[in-house]
């Protein structure tokens, strides 16, 4: 997501100024690569959207360190939502119900959250058909969005409210926000319910003391373009939503079998076996020496008597 990039860049810059032993490195991972759990073996921390984190929390043991909180939200539990927008001149779409059979545009480089949040909004309002509306990836350039709405390639646009606020006023004034919610824990106009947002998570490779230090450090940083780090949100709702929607990415993860765990950590298992075998040999050898010395002392005492 473009909205979180300035916060990430500022955070890395601040970390590099205080971290003397190693330089923080930013590496981008695709959603597909995350399905292979070995993709995280060299990663200490992962910055991910809520739905991606939820999948990895359940199946890869990630632990939330700190969550992103926009200044417009009451808490990190209400840090993300989606605005559904239509062309003002399109009088055929005035409510979410009117989107039945329509196409919703998802800008390139947007997070997976917009699609998940829109689908859950449909479900909460009783529109449970799996094909109630379709989604289409469109250009990430806002100049092309109105053209897409005009020519009918899309009927509506799903957008992060923070991104909508940054659009030129001339663009915003030509769009209508469907069924806006403006009196809740997220004060920007939006259509869907609110959810936890982006999160910094620790992998199994990260040390416990280091993670505690990082959490305190992140929360001490100043906001960047209206975004800051806050205590970790409650992502249980995200798990419930993804399970309820039978989300393809979420359900694509599976728990590892014992065989996979052994194969993944074969070197460590072998090392543990060597250590255990050496300990057994040492114990047997030591016991034998003790028994032999005890017998020698006993025989010597008998001869003296």
Model-derived regions, located:
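A ligand-binding cleft/hinge motif common to bilobed small-molecule-binding domains
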Residues: 47-61, 121-124, 150, 155-184
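Extracytoplasmic small-molecule ligand-binding "clamshell" domains
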Residues: 1-61
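Short helix-initiation/N-cap motifs at beta->coil->alpha
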Residues: 25-37, 69, 129-147, 151
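Short beta-strand->loop
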Residues: 62-77, 131-134, 169-194
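Short, aromatic-rich amphipathic segments at membrane interfaces
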Residues: 239-266
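Extended ligand-binding regions for polar small-molecule ligands
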Residues: 9-18, 89-90, 174-249
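Bilobed "Venus flytrap"/periplasmic-binding protein-like clamshell domains
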Residues: 1-17, 77-146, 162
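Alpha-helical transmembrane signal-anchor helices
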Residues: 258-294
